Amino acid sequence: MSTSNGSTENIQKPLRKIPDITGTPILTAIKDRLDFFYNQGQYEYFQSRVKKNNSTILRMNMIPGPFASNPKIVALCDAASFPTLFDPSKVSKVNSLTGNYMPALSFTGGYRVCAYLDPSEPTHTKIKQVFFNAQAAKKDTFIPTFVSTFNSMFDKMDAEVESKKKAEFTKFNEAAVFEFVGLALVGPKPAREVFDSAKKSVFFQFHPFITAGLPALVEELAFHMFPFPSFVAKSSYKILYEYFSTGGSWILDNAEEIGLSREEAIHHLIFTWAINAYLGIRTCLMRLFKWIVASGPDLQEKLAREVRSVVRSEEGKITFAGIEKMELVKSVAYESFRFDPPVQVQYGTAKSDLIIESHDGKYQVKKGEMLCGFQPMATRDPKVFDRADEFVPDRFMGDGKKLVKHVLWANGYGTDAPKADDKICAGKDLGVLVGRLLIAVMFLRYDKIGGVVGKTMEEVDVIVNELTKVAV
C-alpha cells in the first residue's frame, strides 16, 4: 500500500475513517444533485459537507449521478490531499476527465481522445507532442492575434454600452475567444456556423453538467438523468470536422509524421480545440474579468499605471518581454486562478489501495475508487494561504511568488511545466498568458470598468455599465 502526501509537514498523523455520506442509493444521489445545481451551488455543496463532517476527505456523491453515472467518489478538499491526483504512480487518468461519466465514443469518431487517455498510453504522448508543435509554430501570432481580436471585441462592447447602457461580457467574450483560438491555434478565422457547432457539440456531450435557467424539474428530466445519443450531434460535428480537415491540415500533417493517422488526429484536434482550449480560455477570462471589475477603481488604477508604463518602455507594443515585467498583472492573473479556478474539479482512479494524507490525518482509499479533487477548496486552503477567502491582487508579488506553486490547476502545481509524457494540460502556459493579455488590452483602452457582479462563485457573468476610456 502506498502513501500520498501533499503536505510538507513531517509529523505522525492518525489513521482515520473516511466519512461516508453517500446515503441511500439513487435517492440521496438525486437529492445531492439538486443541492449541487439548485439549492446550494457547487462551492457550498462541498464546503457544507466538509464542515458538517469535520473532514476534508469524504466519500460522497457527485454529479451527474443517476442514471447517467455512478455518483460515488472520494472528495479531496484541501491542499495536502489534492496533489494525489498529480501522481501517475497512484492514480490513473483513463476515461476520468469527468469522473464516472463519459460520453459515448461515437461523439468523437470512435476514438478515445487525449483528455481521456492516461500518460502511460502511447497515443497520449504522440498527440500531446502534436499540440506542443502546433503551439510552437504559431507562437509569434499569439499576442498580435489576441490584441486585435479583443480590441475588436471591446469596440463592440463600447457601442453596446453607449446604445443600451449595458453589455453582457459573457456574450462578447465567448465569441472573441472562439475567434482567437481559431486564428491563433489553427489558422483560418472560424465562421459563425463553426462557433455554433462547437457550442452544440459541447452541450450534447456534457449536458449532464449543465444548467440553462429552466425549471429544475425540466432540466432534471431533460439534461441530467440520461446521456444523449451521438446522432443528435452528427450535423454539428460534421461542420467542425470540415473546418479542421482544411484549416488544420498542417497540424494533421505533423500528426502523420509523428505516427498518428489523420483520421484519428482530427478527432483529437476537434476535442482539444473546442473543449479544452475554447472552454478553458473562455472560463478563465470570464472569471478574471469578474474579479477585476469587483475589485473596483483602486486596483484598476494600479493595473493601468503598470501596463502603460511597461508598454511605453516596449516602444508602445504589448510583447512577451513586456508581459513578464508586469508584476501586478501577473499576480492578479494567478490570484484569479487561485481564488476562482476555471476548472473546478479534477479526477483520477486509484491504481491501488492508497493512504492519502490531509493536513491532520491519514485515510485509506481502495483500488478503483474515483478520486475527485475540488480545486477551489484546495486553493483557498487557510493552512497555505492567509486571507484565503479574499481576492488579494498582490498576493503573488515579492516573497509571495513562492506561493505560486500552490495554485493547483491544469493537473499540476502552479510552477509545473507541461511535458509530452505527463497529464499537465498542454495549454497551461497559454492559459496564464491570455489572462495577462486581457488585462493589458483592457487598461491600454480604459481608465475604469464598472458593472454588476454576481455574489456567488456560480455567477460568473458581469453586466458592464461603465467603460471609461483613457483620457487623450
Swiss-Prot record:
Its cofactor is heme. It comes from the Eukaryota. Pathway: Lipid metabolism; oxylipin biosynthesis. The keyword Heme applies. Its EC number is 4.2.1.121, 4.2.1.183. GO terms for molecular function: heme binding; hydro-lyase activity; iron ion binding; monooxygenase activity; oxidoreductase activity, acting on paired donors, with incorporation or reduction of molecular oxygen. Induction: Induced by treatment with salicylic acid (SA) and osmotic stress. Expressed mainly in bulbs, and at lower levels in roots. Heme binds at C425. One of its GO terms (biological process) is oxylipin biosynthetic process. This is Divinyl ether synthase CYP74. Divinyl ether synthase involved in oxylipin biosynthesis. Catalyzes the conversion of (13S)-hydroperoxy-(9Z,11E)-octadecadienoate (13-HPOD) to etheroleate and (13S)-hydroperoxy-(9Z,11E,15Z)-octadecatrienoate (13-HPOT) to etherolenate. Catalyzes the conversion of (9S)-hydroperoxy-(10E,12Z)-octadecadienoate (9-HPOD) to colneleate and (9S)-hydroperoxy-(10E,12Z,15Z)-octadecatrienoate (9-HPOT) colnelenate. It comes from Allium sativum. Keywords: Fatty acid biosynthesis, Fatty acid metabolism, Heme, Iron, Lipid biosynthesis, Lipid metabolism, Lyase, Metal-binding, Oxylipin biosynthesis. It catalyses: (13S)-hydroperoxy-(9Z,11E)-octadecadienoate = etheroleate + H2O; (13S)-hydroperoxy-(9Z,11E,15Z)-octadecatrienoate = etherolenate + H2O; (9S)-hydroperoxy-(10E,12Z)-octadecadienoate = colneleate + H2O; (9S)-hydroperoxy-(10E,12Z,15Z)-octadecatrienoate = colnelenate + H2O. Belongs to the cytochrome P450 family. The keyword Transmembrane helix does not apply.
